[in-house]
Amino acid sequence: MSETKTKPHLPDLTATRVHHIGLTVASLDRALEFWEAFLGVERLWRMMLDRPYLGRHVGYPGVKIDAAFVPLPGGAILELLEYQLDGRVQNPEATANPGNMHICLSVTNAQSAWERAVALGAKPVAPAGPVDVDGGPNKGARAAYLRIHDGITLEMIQPAPGR
């Protein structure tokens, strides 16, 4: 005898776009230095966030967060957050760890982008540089993983010709 599970009714959802991607960092100054230099852009804003709603929103009542928005290619926004709290600890940076995330930027030249990131202090996962993708949906692309500030993984992909 099999049981039929009924799915709960869910309210309608109309997601229209990615609003922003948030990264918690140890030093907002260091993070801004990397992202502004790497992307060749200026932050949209930087401010200390300390409104009463914020602590309720993020789960740390009374918190202050030094925050900035940086424009990403294609119109998305990168939000950088430095929580002003004692006792913060680094998340494990290994890409296989649950909860680990990465940002992937599409670039026109993976080798040049890799060299630029390394010159700005990024640590390559594959020291020889970008790898050629030889199978799957990105076959023909060139890609690289690098560790940037705070152990964050930055991926760059140069799409296959014609894609």
Model-derived features with residue positions:
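Short, solvent-exposed aromatic-acidic interface loops
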Residues: Q84-D86, P161-G162
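Short consensus segments that form the blades of beta-propeller domains
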Residues: D12, G59-Y60, E93-A94, G135
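Vicinal oxygen chelate
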Residues: M1-T14, V18-A26, D66-A76, N91-R163
